[in-house]
Structures are given as C-alpha cells and as structure tokens.
Amino acid sequence: TNLNLASNKNRIVKLTNPLFIGGDSIRRVQPDGGGQTGSTLQIFKEGRPLGQFFTLKYAGKDANGVSQYYDKNNNLTTTPLNGVDYHYVGDAQPKLLLGWGNTFTYKKFDLSVFFRGVFGNKIFNATRADLSYVVTAGQTNISPYATDDKRTDARNNLFSSRYVEDGSYLRLKTVSLGYNVNSRLLNKVKIRSLRAY
C-alpha cells in the first residue's frame, strides 16, 4: 500500500505588478456568459490565500420569485452591483489531497488500483449558470420549463454563490489485472517469463 496525503496553505504577501500599484487586490477569473459583463469570480488579495471565490452572495427568491442577493452591507437586494456587493464565498484550494495505491495478489493473479481525491474545495459551475439563464431559455435544447426560475427573473444566473459547489471527489484513476504465466510452460518454448494484462 502507498498512501500520500497533502495539505497546502498559502498567503499572498505582496502584489507587485505595476498595473495594480495603490491597490491591495486583483480581481480575476472572468468567465463568459449571457449577462455577465464585468463579473469576476476570484480575488488575489494581500493577506488572503490564493483561489478565494469573491463574488455575489445568493439569498434565494423574494415573494415574487425574483432572485435576491446580499449587498455589501448584508441587506437583501434584487439589483446587486457587480464588483461592489461581493463576498467571500469559498476556497478553490483543497484542504486535503489524497493518493492511494494498492496491489492485491492471489496465486498467479495480481490487481493494482490507484485512487486520487481532493477534499474541502469549491468549484464554480459556469455550465449550470449559463443553462439556467431564463432570458435565453428555449435557445438551447434545454426546455425553459426545466428550470425552477420564473421567466421574469432576468438576474437568476448572475455569477454568485448559487453556482459555487463542493469540488471534493474520490476517483479510481487506474486499475490493472495481471496474470503471470506458469514458468514450467514457458521453459518448453524458451521464454523466461510472460505476464498477461
């Protein structure tokens, strides 16, 4: 058995790019999508870790079924300001990385497996945000009736914590089954060893 565990911590000490002199942060990650002009998802800020999601904070629907968000003072609004009403909503960096490999043997057979995983990180689901946009519903092969948003909720897909999801996973990356052919059979044909996968 081989087991590797890692946990990394980082912190931005200083931003030195001349384009950002006088500021303490850089807004990054501008995914494309309908109605998303000027939206950013992450921030590089002095004193904070790399990979922080910094965007609108979703607060559900109001009584009329319209998406609402928290403004910078934590008051509810249906018309949030891009780049102003932003909050920290998660970390893209995993808290734990895992690699585990093992080989099992039985007589002439062996089975090797390798698992990889990350835990405690967030991801942004831009596909879900784009396909949920009620303004363009019906222009894709997804029925506008498949969404739980009203057609009048034109801000339902604003890049926000609504689409920040758990990014943890554990995956089987490789698996191989092998068989070592009996050496007595191989000696007859002058082969030292033969292994089948």
Task: State each model region's role.
Residues T1-A92:
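Conserved small-residue
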Residues N2, G99-G101, T174-G178:
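Membrane-embedded beta-strand positions in outer-membrane beta-barrel channels/transporters
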Residues N4, L97, T103, L185-K190:
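Core subunits and conserved enzymes of cellular information-processing
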Residues L5-R11, Y106-K108, F115-N121, T174, ...:
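Transmembrane beta-strands of outer-membrane beta-barrel pores
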Residues D91-F124:
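Glycine-rich, aromatic-lined ligand/substrate-binding cores of catalytic
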Residues V118-Y197:
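Extracytoplasmic gating/loop element in the C-terminal half of outer-membrane beta-barrel translocons
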